[in-house]
Amino acid sequence: MERSPDVSPGPSRSFKEELLCAVCYDPFRDAVTLRCGHNFCRGCVSRCWEVQVSPTCPVCKDRASPADLRTNHTLNNLVEKLLREEAEGARWTSYRFSRVCRLHRGQLSLFCLEDKELLCCSCQADPRHQGHRVQPVKDTAHDFRAKCRNMEHALREKAKAFWAMRRSYEAIAKHNQVEAAWLEGRIRQEFDKLREFLRVEEQAILDAMAEETRQKQLLADEKMKQLTEETEVLAHEIERLQMEMKEDDVSFLMKHKSRKRRLFCTMEPEPVQPGMLIDVCKYLGSLQYRVWKKMLASVELPFSFDPNTAAGWLSVSDDLTSVTNHGYRVQVENPERFSSAPCLLGSRVFSQGSHAWEVALGGLQSWRVGVVRVRQDSGAEGHSHSCYHDTRSGFWYVCRTQGVEGDHCVTSDPATSPLVLAIPRRLRVELECEEGELSFYDAERHCHLYTFHARFGEVRPYFYLGGARGAGPPEPLRICPLHISVKEELDG
């Protein structure tokens, strides 16, 4: 039952004063009674006695002892009741004044819909609220409660959305753990291949150097053997010449002609043959560059498929070079993934230079191959939820589609008519960023199909792979190996 605003629920002032400690003048806390009959807080009287030689009552000064302290349960109960009633009185006063107009002291029975304020009957005539829509509190509360129920429903839906988003992040975290383990193994395999390539190259260079060293050592040994033999011949000739010089004059001169002819036939020493030193530059000169070029020759693909952009219909091979449409399967949600069509992107972003790639289409009956502009605000993933893939939305491609008179090739430019060309089984794409040209060729027939002219900006390779029309197994779309060359420019 609601109390009248005129009734005061609080205790009398004199009664409250009887429940105050004579030391701290606050309501008793753990009240105790001395032998003389006076009451104090246990803590207050204990602090007073700490500075006294002989404990006495703080009021009448009678002698006392800590052993005389007796807990006064009745007084403690009265203090607890007093504090409880004061708290209740404070709440009642707050409640009573919160429902009364502070300006006119009237009952708050109206609500201003413009100012969103509670009003009394006198406030309604106030100039500040003239012309405003005013409703009774009960009606307004009913309307606002209905709105709050709608807000509650909206908040519950938002909470469900947050919970669904949390489950999405849980799925992403689990996917990343599995993907990281698989990716770690693949990375190690690829680096093992690189290390094996470098090991083979290192061994080949060391073997070539060892073979050159062996050949030049054999040549040096042969030359040294020849020189040793010639030296021995000359030593024998010197010894013979010394003996002839000791003979008498007639004998010495008789042998002069044959001696001169013999000495003339002795060989002259040849200079050191060129190329006898190990060719250091052959093995160390630009070694890293030469090995890098050789390594580059083993790289056959200009880019790979990006599985993070692949729609739920598509499955990308482990080596990221082929993609197949196996029908829709639930994938981890991420903003980069296409959701409205079976599309995916290449791993590279092209903004300058010349680039080319070839795609094996085989007997695929529904495909698109081209590029898509990378949006500056959100990247290529800004296109992932778009249903309109044409030049107006940043897509440039050639595709195979069904027509009344059979399949034919068309472009993403709605202004062009269908291309009257045979369906290519292998498509070559050439992108000239600076020239603003994107050309398509039938790689098997070596014929030009179509060329877009536009300011492309930053683009990524774009692919669409429709489902199989027949009952046979789905065919993959593959990026074809190409020979990658390096253009060398020398300064000056």
From Swiss-Prot:
Residue ranges annotated as zinc fingers (RING-type) are 21-61
Which PROSITE patterns does its entry note? Answer: B302_SPRY, ZF_BBOX, ZF_RING_1, ZF_RING_2
List residues modified as N-acetylmethionine.
1
Q: What class of enzyme is it?
A: transferase
The record's InterPro entries line, in alphabetical order, gives:
B30.2/SPRY, B30.2/SPRY_sf, Butyrophylin_SPRY, ConA-like_dom_sf, PRY, SPRY_dom, TRIM/RBCC, Znf-RING_euk
Is the Cell cycle keyword given for this protein? no
UniProt catalytic activity: S-ubiquitinyl-[E2 ubiquitin-conjugating enzyme]-L-cysteine + [acceptor protein]-L-lysine = [E2 ubiquitin-conjugating enzyme]-L-cysteine + N(6)-ubiquitinyl-[acceptor protein]-L-lysine
Q: What residue ranges carry the coiled-coil annotation? A: 210-249
| Subcellular compartments | Cytoplasm; Nucleus
Q: Which residues bind Zn(2+)?
A: 101, 104, 123, 129
- Phosphoserine: residues carrying this PTM: 4, 8
One Gene Ontology BP term is:
protein ubiquitination
- B box-type zinc finger segments: 96-137
Entry EC number(s): 2.3.2.27
Q: Output one GO MF annotation.
A: zinc ion binding
| GO CC annotation | cytoplasm; nucleus
Keywords in UniProt for this one?
Answer: Acetylation, Apoptosis, Coiled coil, Cytoplasm, Metal-binding, Nucleus, Phosphoprotein, Transferase, Ubl conjugation pathway, Zinc, Zinc-finger
Q: What is known of its domains?
A: The RING finger domain and the coiled-coil region are required for the apoptosis-inducing activity.
Subunit text: Interacts with PKM isoform M2, but not isoform M1; this interaction may compete with that between PKM and FGFR1, and hence reduces FGFR1-dependent tyrosine phosphorylation of PKM. Interacts with IRF7; this interaction promotes IRF7 proteasomal degradation. Interacts with TRAF3; this interaction promotes TRAF3 activation.
| Purpose | E3 ubiquitin-protein ligase that participates in multiple biological processes including cell death, glucose metabolism, and in particular, the innate immune response. Mediates 'Lys-63'-linked polyubiquitination of TRAF3 thereby promoting type I interferon production via RIG-I signaling pathway. Can also catalyze 'Lys-48'-linked polyubiquitination and proteasomal degradation of viral proteins such as influenza virus PB2. Acts as a negative feedback regulator of TLR7- and TLR9-triggered signaling.
Q: What is this protein called?
A: E3 ubiquitin-protein ligase TRIM35
